[in-house]
Structures are given as structure tokens and as C-alpha cells.
Amino acid sequence: MTSIIEKPEPNFNSLHDFYLNAAHKIHNPDRAVMFYKEKGKWEQLTYQDILDGVEQLGAYFMELGLQKGDRVALMMDNCPEYYVIDQTIQKLGLVNVSVYPTLTGEETAYIINDSSSKVLFVGNAFLFKKFKKVEGDCATVMKVVVMPKDLEQGEKFTDYTSVLVEGEAFKDKYASAVAERFASVVKSDLSTFIYTSGTTGMPKGVMLTHYNFMSNCYDAKDLCPAITSDDLYLSFLPLSHVFERLATMYLSTYIGAQVAFAENIDKVAQNIQEMRPTLMAAVPRLLERVHDKVYKSATEKGGISAKIFLWALKVGGEARVKRNEEKMVGPLLAMQVAIAEKLVYSKIKAKMGGRLKMFVSGAGALPVHVGEFFANLGMRVQEGYGLSETSPLVTVNEFHRQVYGTVGRVAPRQMVAIQDIETKKILAVQTYDTFEAKYASEEGEILVKGPNVMQGYWNRPEATAEVFDEEGWFHTGDIGKFDRGYLRITDRLKNMLKTSLGKNIYPTQIENVLLRSPKLEQVFIIGDKREFLTAIIHPSMDELKSAFGGRKDYFEVSDPFIQDEEIKKWMQDDVKKLSENLAKFERIKDFIVKREPFSVEAGDMTITLKIKRKVVMEKYADEIEGMYA
């Protein structure tokens, strides 16, 4: 029977041990570890600066009487303070409960209450105002710490600066108690509750231990030895999400890399130029936008420059295929690649700061053409796969072997199985050590075993029992198969549409085909229990304005859908052409044109930019019915 071969790993007991090792053994305490922008200027913090903050905050927590296992909630955007707070939590054996800043007040109150959080950190005045509206519903919170000074003071409220000042005064008093507490923290202790921002239902608190994350860091480093202590991450995805927490916070700490916090999502391009990162974690939708902008900028004016760009893409594609097939890149092709590098690739890389080794893509399916596009330009996008429940990494494309359309090789400390959806028979089991480059399997639900798999859902024993079987396999709810030795994701099982004619359809695959059109920004496929498929499509506003001009009646009316038949015909041309790549039963018969994009703010997307199917189906039920009338 297939089993996991034990791998050597460092002797660390906690995530705070990672930090101490980086500060004292990989580097020294005076090395800059973190960069952030304040009042238009990039500032830095050293390892010692962070350690000082952890010491002060730790003493403050002890004065509050926090016990091992108590929960501390963080409702804040990415910032150095988040790092200090989290390291203090890990050192004292507390539990980080991160609340997405985009959640409603009611959702925030639900998470605080469900976790019984005793302390809440709030990042800004806007978030504080949101909390104040539901404060009365958060009975377990005994102290609220706000980042800005002078928002509100009192027995229950204070500000972060005051907390550090108080902690400094308590340091000597609690020095031995803090040391004893830290010594008591072990790998199996809880580190965090990650509340899933799923597309259906109330969020569940995923319980992850120190070792869940630690083993995942060991796996990530083993799968990608190219990441080193000289790297600089640019962090812009929310640390509330497990993907960014692992990739930017814990993995960077483990290897001793530096982190720069982007100002916000709109400033990422500017911040890349300023900080010149070597590594970035990104979700597929953001990479799609980069692809669209680069392609449009290079080709829209036509002429010789557009021809050179397209030639460079072609040459890069030929070289990519050769390398993936482990064939020699001949002298003529190598010379063409060198010319393309000088004329095209280097200029695009310079806009990415000039030092970027790779993007790490996760939290959703990366369209094949987007991954290949970056690879053709000599830039790596390493797509991986995981969930909050798996800390998150399960598989990732290896640095030396990229197979776009797959999510890579099984991590060294894990097992992945494929189970038939109907019969529940195990169709395949793979580990890192059983890897074969030509291995393929049938399709089914993806199951996972390993030290990265969660302990369960907080306060939800029934929900926990639903996702673990008698053999200890965690059922991911994702459909996939092995292809060329790597895992390939088809879709979420709950996303599967079954037409009234009995056809099983996975909408994400169809959506990704149609999204190859630069005219289409978002596609949402409909068809469960229907005779045929339809869609809600949001067009690219840049392309729309370019094609039809800036007429206000397209963009500034109350109707959520654009009724103009000329615009629909303009989009239909691309839909029809791209649908030639689909089976007849996968082609949409009709669609409606959504004026505004699906968004997190509107409540119809998750924080990782996945459309919430149930929400959209309910929100636009009448318009959807109209397509089937």
C-alpha cells in the first residue's frame, strides 16, 4: 500500500522558533526584515524591532490574564503590526483569529462570538466604526486595541501605541512567566482559526496547529529550492487568508526572506517598481489582468512593435515546449530567444522590477493561456493547489518543470487520492516519492492525508465528520485527476451542473475558455437542472469604451444589465468563436450583459475573487429565468 516516506526536518517546536532562527542564525537581529510605506516614504523594521514589539505585547497580554489557547482576533489590513501581533500570539500559545476586513459587521460579530475571542485588534477608523455597530453582540471581547491613536479610550478601548508603552513597563514583571509560557508551546498546539469565506453558508473556523503550518513550509521549500534567504516578497493579498499567511508570513520567516507590504491593491504596480521583489503570491484573476494589460499595450497600435512582440511570444513558446519535454533548445532557437529577451522580455521584466523569480499562483484555477503567456516571456508562474483545511499547500508545479493547466506535484509529506464520485472506490493514490512524469489517472474527488491537514472545524463536530472518512482521508470537495504526474483540477464538486438532459458540466472550465476573449472580464455559467447553458457576462470596460466610446448611458444608469443589442452582438462574436473549442452541450445558448462587475464589496465574490454561485443565482433569479422563458 502507498504510504508517506518520512522526511528529515528541523527541530522546531513553534512558529516563533522560525522567527528566532531567522533573526539569530540565518541573519542577525540588525538586519531589515520588513518594509512598509508611510507618508510616501518606504520605512523598514529589523528583526530586533519586531522582537522588541513581541516582548512588549507579550507582557501586555500576560497583564490582561490571557491563558494558553485563548483567542485573539485581528481585523486589519496587511501591515507590520499584524506581524508583531501574530508572532506574539504564536510565542504565547494563543490562537490567531483573523477577520477579513471586507466582511460585514454581522459576519465579523459571528466570527468573534464563534471563536470566543477575548481581544480584538482593529486596523483603522473605518473598521472600528464597523465594529462599534455590532459591539453589543460581541460579549466575549474584553479589550479592543485600535491602530490609530485617539479613536476611543476607556476601560475596554485603547490604542496600539499605548499597549506597547504599557507592555514595556510590564516586561520585567512578566519576563519569567513569558519564558515559561513559550517553553510550554509545542507543535501540536493550535496556531490559528481560519474562517472559510466559502461561496455558500456561514463560515467555519478551520483549526490549524503550529505543525500544520510548519510541515507546509518544509514541503514548500523542498518543492522549490530556488527560494532563499536573499529573497524579497511583496505582500498584497490579505493575511487573513491562509494562502498569503503561509506564503508571505511563515514561509518567508522560515527561509529568512524579507517582506515588503504593498500600500494597497491599486498601488501594487507602483510598489513593484519601487521595491523590486523577487517573489509574489497572486490569485489567478490578478494575473489575468496583468496578461490582458501587457498584451493590449503591446499589440493595440499594430505596426512593427506589435509584430516583434508576437514573434517573441512565439519564440518563447517554442522554447518553453522544448524545455518541458526535456529536449535541447537548439542553437538557432537559443539565438532567437536571446534576441527576444533583449527586444521584448527584458522590458516587460523591468516593469515587474527586474528581479522577479516567480509568481506563486493559488486560491483558484489559473487559465492555461495565462500561465503559458508568462512562461513564453521568460517569467515563471508556479501554480499550486490547496485549501484552508490543508494549511494550504497540497501540490505545486516544480521550479524546473511547469505543466500549465495542472497544479503540480504532490508535496513530500502528503498523500493525494482520487475517489470515484459514484462508487467511492479509490482510483489512484500518489505521493511525492511515487511520482512518474507520464502517470495519469481517472477523474474523481481529490482526497488528502498529511501533517498539514486541519484538526477539524471549531465547534462544528458534524461538519468535521462530513469531510473525514473512516480511513482518515480529508475530502476536499474538488474534482480532479493526475496528468503527466501532476494533479489537474477540474472544478469544485458543488459547482458541478447537471443539465436536465443528464450531462455533468463543470462551469469553471467553460468560463476559462470564454475568458480568453479580451472583451470579457467575468463569466458566470448557469445550467443546473436546465436543458441548456446560459451565462451572465461582465465585459471589459476598457475594451467596451474603446469599441463604442464613452457614452454615459452605457455606464451610468440604474439597470444592472446593459440592454444594448449592438454591445451584445460585439461580445457574441467572440463567444461564438471561442465556443468552437467546447462540446456542443457546453456551449451557452444565451447570456445577459452585467453592467457592474461582480465584487467582494457587492457581496457576490469571495476575498480570493471567486464568484459566490448561490448568492448570484438568488440575486439575479428573475433575469436568469428570463433567459429560459
Positions of the model-derived regions?
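Conserved AMP-binding/adenylation subdomain of ANL enzymes
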Residues: 214-232, 239-345, 355
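Conserved ATP-binding/catalytic segment of the ANL
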Residues: 434-499
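Conserved AMP-binding A3 loop
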Residues: 44-48, 183, 191-217
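Conserved C-terminal "lid"/linker of ANL adenylate-forming enzymes
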Residues: 497, 522-525, 569-629
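Structural core segment of the AMP-binding/adenylate-forming
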Residues: 64, 91-166, 570, 576
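Conserved pre-ATP/AMP-binding loop-to-beta segment of ANL
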Residues: 30-32, 168-195, 202, 226-232
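ANL superfamily adenylate-forming
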Residues: 39, 128-187, 294-345
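Conserved AMP-binding/adenylate-forming core of the ANL superfamily
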Residues: 33-79, 83-87, 104-109, 159-164, ...
